[in-house]
Amino acid sequence: MNITDVRIRKISAEGKMKAIVSVTFENQFVVHDIKVIEGQNGLFIAMPSRKTPDGEFKDIAHPIDTQTREQIQKAILDEYEKVKNLDMQE
């Protein structure tokens, strides 16, 4: 499944969450509310999730295999770096 669009909405507030992202696949299916998070080992993505009654977070949508997760994460983080660098130049 090819990623055909990545839309980044940067978060300006201080904190670990840096952006909220929408990813489109094959110009036919979109996943909203993927988060870019600054962790101890650098940036990573968190798939959209909801909080269960017992306080646990469960993914609403997520990749089934590691290769797909890595492909999605690379596309998102590459686009995030482009957007971040554009903002720094302005």
Curated annotation (Swiss-Prot):
Family: Belongs to the SpoVG family.
Pfam families: SpoVG (PF04026)
Biological role stated in the UniProt entry: Could be involved in septation.
Any one GO BP annotation for this protein: division septum assembly
SUPFAM superfamilies in UniProt: SpoVG-like
Protein keywords: Cell cycle, Cell division, Septation
NCBIfam families hit by this protein: PRK13259.1
Domain of life: Bacteria
Name this polypeptide is given: Putative septation protein SpoVG
Keyword hit for Cell cycle: yes
